[in-house]
Amino acid sequence: MAIEAAIGVPAFGLFIAMIILGGRVEIAKQSVEAAAYEAARAASIERTQSEAISSGKAAATSSLNDQGLQCATTNVTVNAAAFNAPLGTTAQVTARVTCKVDVADLAIPGLPGTRTITATASSPVDAYRERR
């Protein structure tokens, strides 16, 4: 009985840790995707390229904070070149959010200490809205 326990308990513990890891990574993916969509949307409703970039970055950061996601490092990139398009032309703003999630506390052998999660989202800019 002791031998079975010596083999079974660590394997069961590793199984539980992998379930926790999978859940944590999936929740982080959803949070990063939501932040990317919010950043793209916030950027697309601004009137200037510089306002779009700053608004998109602020929206992504706020979204990650609101969802309680603790990123070791965060990178938000907003491509607002659509604001240079002439009126009447369809264009999109794209936001890319990258978050390194710390998973070292799970102490799973062979697992890196962080997982990098990246999401990209686009939102259309109103083709006939005045741009400055």
Question: What residues fall within each predicted segment?
Answer:
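Alpha-helical assembly-interface signal, strongest on the long, hydrophobic N-terminal helix that forms
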Residues: M1-T61
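Short, conserved structural patches
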Residues: I45, Q49-R132
